[in-house]
Amino acid sequence: MSAARPQFSIDDAFELSLEDGGPGPESSGVARFGPLHFERRARFEVADEDKQSRLRYQNLENDEDGAQASPEPDGGVGTRDSSRTSIRSSQWSFSTISSSTQRSYNTCCSWTQHPLIQKNRRVVLASFLLLLLGLVLILVGVGLEATPSPGVSSAIFFVPGFLLLVPGVYHVIFIYCAVKGHRGFQFFYLPYFEK
C-alpha cells in the first residue's frame, strides 16, 4: 500500500501513454515527443519585422487605395526594393503635382479624406462639437470670474465646460492619431465607430 510513486517531472508531461492514442508507441511502449524548443531572434530582426507588419496593417486599416505610408519621419518618400513596389508607383510617375505640394496637402487635410472618417462623419462632428462647446463654456466661466456679475456663478459654466471639453479633446486626438497610424490608436477601440 505504501508503494513509492516516482516523482513527476516536466518531461513526463510530454509523454504519450498508450491510452492517449496518437501516432503509435515506440519500442518502449510509450511514445515520446522531442524536447521543447523556443526560437530566439535578434532584437533588431523582431523590431524590423514589427515595423513592416505595422506598416502593412496601417495600409489595410487606414489607407483607402492601398498606398504605402511613408516610413520617413518628415513625410519624404522612402526607398523601396523592387519586390515591394506599390501599385501606385506608375501613378506617381505621371503625376503633375509637385512632391512638396502633395506632401503639404497630405499633412494638412488628408485625415479628413479617410474612408472611416467619411463613414462616421456624425461621430467626428460630435467630437468637435463637444470640444468647441467645452471651450466656449470655460471661456464664459473665465469671463464671469474676471468681471463678476451678481447672481451668476462662474461654476455654472466651468463644470459643464470641463465635462464637455475632456471627452471632446480625447476623441478628437484619438481619431486623428488613429488616422495617422500612430501605435496604440486604432478605430477598433472606439466602439461607436462603424468599421
Curated annotation (Swiss-Prot):
Keywords: Cytoplasm, Host-virus interaction, Membrane, Phosphoprotein, Transmembrane, Transmembrane helix. Residues 1-33, 48-88 are annotated as: Disordered. Signal peptide: none annotated. GO terms for cellular component: cytosol; membrane; perinuclear region of cytoplasm. Residues 144-154 are extracellular. It is a multi-pass membrane protein. Its main location: membrane. It is found in: Membrane; Cytoplasm, Perinuclear region. The modification Phosphoserine is found at S93. InterPro entries: TMEM134, TMEM_230/134. The chain crosses the membrane at residues 123-143, 155-175. Residues 1-122, 176-195 are cytoplasmic. (Microbial infection) Interacts with Hepatitis E virus (HEV) ORF2. Belongs to the TMEM134/TMEM230 family. This is Transmembrane protein 134. It comes from Homo sapiens.
